[in-house]
Amino acid sequence: MAYPFQLGLQDASSPIMEELTNFHDHTLMIVFLISSLVLYIISSMLTTKMTHTSTMDAQEVETIWTVLPAVILILIALPSLRILYMMDEINNPVLTVKTMGHQWYWSYEYTDYESLCFDSYMVPTNDLKPGELRLLEVDNRVVLPMELPIRMLISSEDVLHSWAVPSLGLKTDAIPGRLNQATLTSNRPGLFYGQCSEICGSNHSFMPIVLEMVPLKHFENWSTSMI
């Protein structure tokens, strides 16, 4: 989860988020090198008196500043396309959960079970227990098995929402009349927090998401008790 004054990304808890973090560092390094070069050129132009007023063209330089940006864009695009393909790929999910956005709460349905469904509302500040997080706790958490591929089907009953859990690298729009899908796999157990990431009305800030990733045996016990 995020912390106050945090500057970096949240700790990666899924293979996709690890790839996104590495890609972020890769792209940031390229941007840093380009910015350093541009600042060096600007400072050199401001401080030196050596100019070439008689130079009309420089084909070598023009070739370099045409080819080099193309190479840089390719170096950015190739890993980006690879991650994009990985995010859309869903291989034999063990569980499917349907998520519906409402103003202003989420509802969940475990489609592999006949009657396992519930609504998830934010816990009001006055009802929080010691240690619980303001604006992030819900009355019903989404319990899922860890280290297994899970498919999320995401849609909306009213307006546009967005189902997002940053530490798992998830952000999928919930659009009325359209069913989007995403896949998630958690590397470790724990609580993972997210929020609606699309402005959807006056209570947009009060639509938290809490995923509780547990071992498969614990998930089976929980699902049995809920049915």
From Swiss-Prot:
Binding locations of Mg(2+): 198
Binding site for Cu cation A1: 161, 196, 200, 207
Binding-site positions, Cu cation A2: 196, 198, 200, 204
EC number: 7.1.1.9
Cofactor note: Binds a dinuclear copper A center per subunit.
Membrane topology recorded in Swiss-Prot or TrEMBL: Multi-pass membrane protein
A matching Pfam family: COX2
GO molecular function: copper ion binding; cytochrome-c oxidase activity
Any one GO BP annotation for this protein: ATP synthesis coupled electron transport
Residue intervals passing through the bilayer: 15-45, 60-87
Topological domain ranges for the Mitochondrial intermembrane compartment: 1-14, 88-227
UniProt KW keywords: Copper, Electron transport, Magnesium, Membrane, Metal-binding, Mitochondrion, Mitochondrion inner membrane, Respiratory chain, Translocase, Transmembrane, Transmembrane helix, Transport
InterPro entries: CcO_II, CcO_II-like_C, CcO_II_C, Copper_CuA, Cupredoxin, Cyt_c_oxidase_su2, Cyt_c_oxidase_su2_TM_dom, Cyt_c_oxidase_su2_TM_sf
Mitochondrial matrix side: 46-59
UniProt subcellular location: Mitochondrion inner membrane
Broadest EC class assigned to this enzyme: translocase
Cofactor(s) the protein needs: Cu cation
UniProt main location, coarse: mitochondrion
Subunit architecture: Component of the cytochrome c oxidase (complex IV, CIV), a multisubunit enzyme composed of 14 subunits. The complex is composed of a catalytic core of 3 subunits MT-CO1, MT-CO2 and MT-CO3, encoded in the mitochondrial DNA, and 11 supernumerary subunits COX4I, COX5A, COX5B, COX6A, COX6B, COX6C, COX7A, COX7B, COX7C, COX8 and NDUFA4, which are encoded in the nuclear genome.
Family membership noted in the UniProt record: Belongs to the cytochrome c oxidase subunit 2 family.
Physiological role: Component of the cytochrome c oxidase, the last enzyme in the mitochondrial electron transport chain which drives oxidative phosphorylation. The respiratory chain contains 3 multisubunit complexes succinate dehydrogenase (complex II, CII), ubiquinol-cytochrome c oxidoreductase (cytochrome b-c1 complex, complex III, CIII) and cytochrome c oxidase (complex IV, CIV), that cooperate to transfer electrons derived from NADH and succinate to molecular oxygen, creating an electrochemical gradient over the inner membrane that drives transmembrane transport and the ATP synthase.
Record protein name field: Cytochrome c oxidase subunit 2
Organism from which the protein derives: Lophuromys flavopunctatus (Yellow-spotted brush-furred rat)
High-level lineage: Eukaryota, Metazoa, Chordata, Craniata, Vertebrata
